[in-house]
């Protein structure tokens, strides 16, 4: 920090002062002598510039972080698990909000982790730059959780969960970060991601009352109508549709990997990539490859299902990538550059029916001839859940590959139906799943065992049970209209553009 210009340095000093003020107000620690036999963990300052939805500087943030890596299990901490919201839950909630014309407001809990209580005796050295005069020999006995501690996330989640439940909210069985309350014949939903809260209700007054309620327990900042969440830019058009995109994230990736001047392409992956392994040199260091694929995977699972198949394929190479694989990664980025303004539309059309599409690319991986499963679930015209996954065994026929894919997709539908039930959306009818293989449909509704299918793992036959219990029902779909095809393999430009439009990706 000493090398920074004075104006810049002052901003960071003020940020650190603000952090210390919050720590003192919450009585995060007490100065004391270190008991014999105890060891004080260290701490450090972490500085970060926060950006808004347009990527511009919002504020300077300084955070005091405990060096939790030196904690000892069973002595300094025990349980550490804390739930994290699923992206599918966010898209589902926004779909319901769009259809019912509900308001969606964003709140940020300041220094959230500092509100959690800890029960262990933990001691920490005094923070650099803020050592108490004349008390240099003392240490901090922690009374509240602090960022960096092993148990901090769990302690905060326990605290906010207590507040929600004590005020009449029900925690979702499908997603522990989702809360709901039915009051005065109207629903309120709250979605929690660490210290970010989304409140959803028909009335502004009800949302403001919720903001006041949370403000009674924690220091809260009202960020207004939702516009930026988990790296996603969210806008609402005049028809009430939500439009999700990650252009800021994509632009940052292009800059990080020096592809700002690269030529855009119209497809994320060439079909020829899958047809042969090809000979090329091993990458000397696969760290850059892993970093790029990881970043692209987040984009693929959040707002861009059109690149999910390409990224799923490239993820298979992370342990031993070659130059051709790295070229394929860069091609995905070039595709994102050309389509950076694509947005995932969450439709306000009056339709909350859950439907699914499932497909498989039989033996598409030439390295081992294993197939790829792909599924897409939509509520009305909104894509809420999708996946691309390589199958673990070699399918002996296209029917077997499609049947395994259908089995995989059916696991998601059970969870989705529970999620909708938690949100008060009726799911009394079987969920329709579109399938383009007639033999799979016959196999799913029949208990016959023949020579061609007797070897199929029994675990996949839970499909029949779901059909018998009227949880799902398969409907034939012509191959040309199978949307999930885009989630199983690289497609030519014309087909890709057609299917991504059906998925709700629009300019």
Regions from the language model: what does each represent?
Residues 1-507:
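Long, low-complexity, charge-biased intrinsically disordered regions
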């Amino acid at each position: 920090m000493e090398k920074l210009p004075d104006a810049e340095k002052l901003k960071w000093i003020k940020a650190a002062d603000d952090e210390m003020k919050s720590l003192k107000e919450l009585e995060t620690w007490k100065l004391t002598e270190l008991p014999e036999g105890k060891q004080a963990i260290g701490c450090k300052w972490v500085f970060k510039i926060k950006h808004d939805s347009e990527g511009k500087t919002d504020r300077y943030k300084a955070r005091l972080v405990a060096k939790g890596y030196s904690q000892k299990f069973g002595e300094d901490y025990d349980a550490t698990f804390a739930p994290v919201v699923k992206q599918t839950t966010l898209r589902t909630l926004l779909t319901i909000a769009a259809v019912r014309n509900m308001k969606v407001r964003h709140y940020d809990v300041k220094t959230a982790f500092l509100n959690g209580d800890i029960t262990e005796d933990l001691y920490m050295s005094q923070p650099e730059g803020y050592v108490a005069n004349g008390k240099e020999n003392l240490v901090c006995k922690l009374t509240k959780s602090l960022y960096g501690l092993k148990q901090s996330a769990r302690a905060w989640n326990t605290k906010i969960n207590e507040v929600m439940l004590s005020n009449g909210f029900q925690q979702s069985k499908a997603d522990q970060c989702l809360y709901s309350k039915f009051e005065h014949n109207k629903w309120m939903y709250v979605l929690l991601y660490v210290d970010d809260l989304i409140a959803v209700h028909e009335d502004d007054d009800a949302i403001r009352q919720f903001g006041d309620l949370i403000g009674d327990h924690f220091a809260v900042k009202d960020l207004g109508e939702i516009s930026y969440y988990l790296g996603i830019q969210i806008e609402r058009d005049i028809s009430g549709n939500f439009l999700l995109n990650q252009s800021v994230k994509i632009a940052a990736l292009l800059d990080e990997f020096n592809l700002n001047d690269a030529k855009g392409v119209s497809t994320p992956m060439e079909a020829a990539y899958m047809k042969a392994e090809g000979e090329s040199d091993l990458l000397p260091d696969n760290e850059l490859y892993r970093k790029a694929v990881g970043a692209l995977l987040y984009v693929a699972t959040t707002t861009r299902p059109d690149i999910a198949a390409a990224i799923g394929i490239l993820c298979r190479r992370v342990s031993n990538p070659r130059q051709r694989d790295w070229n394929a990664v860069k091609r995905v980025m070039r595709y994102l550059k050309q389509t950076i303004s694509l947005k995932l539309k969450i439709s306000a059309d009056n339709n909350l029916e859950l439907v699914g599409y499932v497909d498989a690319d039989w033996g598409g991986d030439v390295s081992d001839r294993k197939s790829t499963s792909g599924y897409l679930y939509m509520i009305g015209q909104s894509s809420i859940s999708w996946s691309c996954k390589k199958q673990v065994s070699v399918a002996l026929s296209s029917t077997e590959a499609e049947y395994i894919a259908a089995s995989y997709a059916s696991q998601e539908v059970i969870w989705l139906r529970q999620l909708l039930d938690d949100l008060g959306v009726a799911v009394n009818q079987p969920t329709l799943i579109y399938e383009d293989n007639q033999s799979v449909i016959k196999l799913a509704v029949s208990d016959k065992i023949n020579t061609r299918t007797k070897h199929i793992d029994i675990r996949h036959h839970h499909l029949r049970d779901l059909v018998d219990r009227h949880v799902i029902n398969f409907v034939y779909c012509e191959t040309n209209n199978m949307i999930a095809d885009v989630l199983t393999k690289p497609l030519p430009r014309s087909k890709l553009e057609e299917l991504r439009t059906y998925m709700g990706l629009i300019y």
